[in-house]
Amino acid sequence: VGALRDFPGCAVMSMVRPRGGDFLYSTDDLAVMEADVRHAKAAGADGVVFGLLEAGGEVDLASCTHLARLCAELQLDFTFHRAVDASCDPVQAVVSLARAGFRRVLTSGGHARAVDGAGTIRAMVDAVKGTGLRVMVGSGVRPDNVVRLLRETGAHEAHGSCRTEVQSAFRHRPAVSFSASGSDYTRHETDTEQVRALVAAAAAIPRPSSGKA
């Protein structure tokens, strides 16, 4: 986070997620998340990204509100991440998040790729008109589909990894592996040209307002 602060004009949002797997968190998990929010602030982050659900798939409003209030006290922006795509009803989830004071949610419309969830994303956008909650479309967003996605969904923002696979220059191949998944000898890096193309494509179309009165 500190290194990223050296790039002017680039807002830094830190992911707050204590473990992999689902988004049903224990009291201990929540305590770790609270500490991570404070650490993100101390490191210079502009905001944090988190998401918590109940066992039945509803938004965990009590825990989310607790973290949101902490963020407000620390003057940190906060976004609800793609946990919304694992919720039992993404449309109702964003309505709940808007009422809880969230100003941004990242979603693929409950599908692996945003292009497949475009209809649900549109319903989510329509459901929170006038609340100030901004819907950010993400997952599989590329320079060649970002315009269509923003137009079809009415989403206010887009998120893309713009990543490319890079081969390692490490020639020795030991018999052990240290990767949880995939190969030890490939990694993903951000592709600068993809980023430029994505930004240019998105900037070329009129932006919808947040709908806040």
Language-model regions: role of each:
Residues 1-62:
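Active-site beta->alpha loop and helix N-cap motifs at the rims of alpha/beta catalytic domains
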Residues 16-20, 54, 84, 111, ...:
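Short, flexible active-site-adjacent loop segments at beta-strand->alpha-helix junctions, enriched
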Residues 46-61, 77-88, 93-94, 103-115, ...:
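Catalytic beta/alpha-barrel core
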Residues 149-213:
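Long hydrophobic alpha-helical segments typical of transmembrane helices together
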Residues 39-55, 102-115, 153-176, 185:
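Glycine-rich phosphate-binding active-site loops on the catalytic face of alpha/beta enzymes
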Residues 22, 57, 87-88, 114-115, ...:
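Generic structural signal for helix capping and beta-alpha/helix-loop junctions
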Residues 1-20, 59-82, 118-143, 180-208:
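Alpha-helix-loop-beta-strand connector modules within alpha/beta enzyme cores
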Residues 21-39, 85-100, 124-131, 137, ...:
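Catalytic cores of alpha/beta
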